[in-house]
Structure formats: structure tokens, C-alpha cells
Amino acid sequence: MLMPKRVKYRKQQRGKMRGKAKGGTLVHFGDWGLKALEPHWITAQQIEACRIAIMRTLKRNGKVWIRVFPDKPITSKGIGVRMGKGKGDVEGWVAVVKPGKILFEIGGINDELAKEALAYAATKLPIKTKIVPRYEIGGEL
């Protein structure tokens, strides 16, 4: 599972997800990319499920780039624990994804197989996504 090796602070505040993605909005490495259209927290398990789905479709051909990394700790208190007494323990890690962010890239295979793999990976995510080519002319997102 993806997670940071070490962090400066164990716990973070939740924060807001306003606006569009500042960086990582263009396909740089591969020929096709999967672009997020909604803001959401993507968990490490969801990223891994997408990676496995893509690899199964590609059957060891081509190359995959994962453009998001879960670096935000998510905490929760145990069931039946009363309020107060400090923040809960770290339960997992998420990547903060804003609209326009490229999540995955695929290269080195034909276009039909790349689109099929990314469409299958998109079913594993809780957000709306769009398959984009390397060079997309026009369009805000």
C-alpha cells in the first residue's frame, strides 16, 4: 500500500478542497491519462485497486505512471469512544485530488487497449473521470 516513509507530523487537519488543481493537469509521461473531474480524497487502497486493474488489462505490456500519492493521514476514533480526549489514531492515507488532476498515465501500447485499461480503472474510483490524450487542444478541465 502507498504511504509516506516518514512524516514531520503524524496528524493533519482535514482542510478544504476548493478550486481546481494547480499542477499535474497535463499528460507528461505517457500517451493517455485519466483526469479527475471532481474533488475527492482518493485512498491508498483505491489507487492500488486502479493500478491492479490497469496491469491486468495491459498484461505486462506498456508502462504505467501513478501521478497521485497518498500523503495525508486520516484519523478516526474507535467505535463507542466519547468525544474529546484528543484526536484519534491514524487509520489510513489519502491523496487530495482536485478537478483537472491527472491520476494515471499509460504509454507504450495501442490506443484502444490504453482507453480500455483506463476505463476499467475509472470504475474503481469514487469520482467522475475523463480519459485524455497527451496533447489535448482547448478545454478548461
Curated annotation (Swiss-Prot):
Disulfide bonds: none
Assigned keywords, A-Z: Ribonucleoprotein, Ribosomal protein, RNA-binding, rRNA-binding, tRNA-binding
A GO biological-process term: translation
An annotated GO cellular component: cytosolic large ribosomal subunit
SUPFAM superfamilies the UniProt entry points to: Ribosomal protein L16p/L10e
Annotated family: Belongs to the universal ribosomal protein uL16 family.
Subunit and partners: Part of the 50S ribosomal subunit.
Entry protein name: Large ribosomal subunit protein uL16
Recorded name of the encoding gene: rplP
